[in-house]
Amino acid sequence: MKKSLLSFAVLMMGAALFTACSNDDDTPELKKVDVSNGMFVVGSGNKKANIDGNVSYIDYQAGAVTANAFQKANGKSLGKTANYIVDYGSKLYIVVDAEATIWVCDKNTLSVVKQINTIDLLGEKDGVSPRAAVGENGNLYVTFYGDSNNGGNGIVAAIDTVNFAKQTTYTVGSYPDGLTIANGCIYVANSDYGNCKNPSISKIDLGSGKVEEIKDEVITNPMQILTLGSDVYYLDYGTYDASWNQMGAGVRKITASGEVTKVVDGTAMCTDGKKVYTVNAPYGAAETTYLIYDAATGTTTSWNPEGIFSPAVIAADPVTGNIFIVSYQENPETGYPGYALPSYTNQYDAQGKFVKKYENTATGPISVVFNTDVKYVQ
């Protein structure tokens, strides 16, 4: 694991040496090219089976998986209920809800740079249950549920990525989860913990610090949120009946002016920068469908990725456009998804054709991030 990731750092050192050469006319001009080397898969673990949170790394060039990569790199566990991973600059940030911890890791080696105890950083009232994060302007912005004394609202905390100190906090809506940045603002999906009484989208103006609440009848249980162009798309889990059948789940679009519309069904989503890909597997439904929403045309098509038993996460490589679906494997004893078993990940090209299957990825898969960077070529 360390060797394959360190080779990337050596490549970048070589690129730096090239750019430091003389500016003679004979010196070839180097072009900056985006590259993608692999994918980190975070699993929340499994509480019933006493399995901690975990990270696996898929190395494209080697065509192999390093399971429990964090533990192998650091000799310790992530802790209970890992929830999210994001890269910003040269670091990875892994959010662990039940431990009130954010692990700051070197992107090339997964070695821990800093363990941020969020209760120590923010206090008992605000630092409970970190959920998701995004990096911008030298800060890591993190959503927190907070404790029961916070008046029903969560917070977003800005944490400096050099000294890892608190910069400021913003009060947002009830049980904030995913967040994204668009048009100089942070948009936050306030899930209300699925109670469907006070869900909303918070909009934080990073210039003024003003927080606005967006409410609409189609905002019922927002969880994940992303940016595509100047618009924001969020995944709403919808509602559940008395038998826990899931209804009304799908992706909604929020325009820069605040208009909210439902665009496509889904229970998981990702974007390649042009389209929104969804898995539509509502709890209690007889079948799973896979949909593609084209943001430019407003049209929806379907596809049928082969080899998926029980999808958990879908993600698009921002460089190659390849689509990855992380799936639970079948429990051979029950025929149901093996929630305490390692997942597997299928790779498809941009046209939806199967490319490769990676075994033994994370247990309890919940979040992924791609190992991307740049290289310089003639």
Where does each model-flagged region fall?
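Residue position within the beta-strands of beta-propeller blades
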Residues: 41-42, 94, 142-143, 188-189, ...
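A short beta-strand motif characteristic of beta-propeller blades
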Residues: 64-77, 111-124, 164-170, 209-216, ...
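Repeated scaffold domains used in trafficking and secretory/extracellular systems
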Residues: 28-29, 77-86, 123-135, 172-183, ...
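Short glycine/acidic-enriched loop and turn motifs that connect beta-strands
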Residues: 45-50, 99-101, 146-151, 192-196, ...
